[in-house]
């Protein structure tokens, strides 16, 4: 790193940031990231952007974060492309621009970045920066869901449940709700409970319904609490 190798500088920065083999030191991490980033090392540019984004070792600065995310993103780094998309989506450090957000999400999603795939699905579902298209939303949710992205699994369950952009399919809805529910997603737990309660996509099973309602209710999902009350009320 002392000899100017950008990959070594970037790795040393990460060691200081995470406190691996050295005492954790954000200022020292920044120093090495800067040296590597100035040589065009994409990962260091991205990590430097994160430091500014999170205010680690430096004052929080959206404009600087955006600058470094952009430099890494234009080199094709998917995490940087996703974060740049997020900045445009939220109007952080730049004028809010949904169409621009979509383009960066799309580039990262094409590289199988699950957060970008999920966010691209959201943009299509809501019609933000693109024409509303439930079939496209379902496509991108599925890519993210298959990589274990929990909110995408839940949203995909909803899409199958309501038949938005896909043929209505309660069994598929239950499958995706279950994957999200097992990971603790409260709304998915409630929906899965409902499927068991009503026998939609699964064999009707009141004890399973109670199990999932309980889990959702414990996380504050009001309909799960009221359905649980109704089930106990009817014995």
What are these model-predicted stretches?
Residues 1-15:
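N-terminal segments that cap or nucleate solenoid repeat domains
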Residues 3-5, 18-20, 25, 38-41, ...:
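Short helix-capping/linker turns of helical repeat alpha-solenoids
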Residues 11-18, 47-54, 83-90, 119-126, ...:
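Hydrophobic face of amphipathic alpha-helices that form TPR/SEL1-like repeat modules
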Residues 31, 35-38, 42, 67, ...:
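Long tandem-repeat architectures and their stereotyped inter-repeat linkers in very large proteins
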């Amino acid at each position: 790193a002392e000899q100017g190798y950008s990959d070594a500088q970037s790795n040393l920065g990460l060691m200081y940031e995470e406190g691996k083999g050295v005492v954790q030191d954000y200022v020292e991490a920044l120093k090495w990231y800067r040296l590597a980033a100035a040589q065009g090392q994409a990962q260091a540019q991205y990590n430097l952007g994160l430091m500014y984004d999170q205010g680690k070792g430096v004052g929080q600065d959206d404009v600087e974060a955006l600058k470094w995310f952009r430099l890494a993103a234009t080199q094709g780094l998917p995490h940087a492309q996703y974060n740049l998309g997020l900045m445009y989506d939220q109007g952080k450090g730049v004028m809010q621009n949904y169409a621009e957000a979509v383009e960066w999400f799309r580039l990262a999603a094409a590289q199988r970045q699950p957060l970008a795939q999920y966010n691209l699905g959201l943009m299509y579902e809501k019609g933000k920066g693109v024409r509303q298209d439930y079939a496209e939303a379902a496509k991108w949710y599925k890519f993210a869901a298959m990589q274990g992205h929990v909110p995408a699994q839940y949203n995909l369950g909803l899409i199958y449940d309501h038949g938005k952009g896909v043929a209505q399919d309660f069994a598929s809805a239950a499958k995706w709700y279950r994957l999200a529910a097992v990971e603790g997603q409260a709304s998915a737990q409630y929906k899965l409970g409902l499927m068991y309660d009503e026998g939609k996509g699964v064999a009707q099973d009141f004890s399973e319904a109670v199990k999932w309602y309980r889990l959702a209710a414990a996380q504050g999902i009001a309909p799960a609490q009221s359905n649980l009350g109704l089930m106990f009320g009817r014995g």
